[in-house]
């Protein structure tokens, strides 16, 4: 049960980070030079 909870939390954190980085990389006012991949 504890392992399943860690797996679920890691998946949620992963998708949240993908959403946040995708939003920031598509926002020219926050990232005009697109240097988020460095």
UniProtKB/Swiss-Prot annotation:
GO cellular component, one term: photosystem II reaction center
Major subcellular location class: plastid
Subcellular location, record wording: Plastid, Chloroplast thylakoid membrane
One of the GO biological process terms: photosynthesis
Coiled-coil intervals: none
Residue stretches spanning the membrane: 4-24
Membrane topology recorded in Swiss-Prot or TrEMBL: Single-pass membrane protein
Subunit structure: PSII is composed of 1 copy each of membrane proteins PsbA, PsbB, PsbC, PsbD, PsbE, PsbF, PsbH, PsbI, PsbJ, PsbK, PsbL, PsbM, PsbT, PsbY, PsbZ, Psb30/Ycf12, at least 3 peripheral proteins of the oxygen-evolving complex and a large number of cofactors. It forms dimeric complexes.
Stated family: Belongs to the PsbI family.
Full protein name: Photosystem II reaction center protein I
Name of the gene: psbI
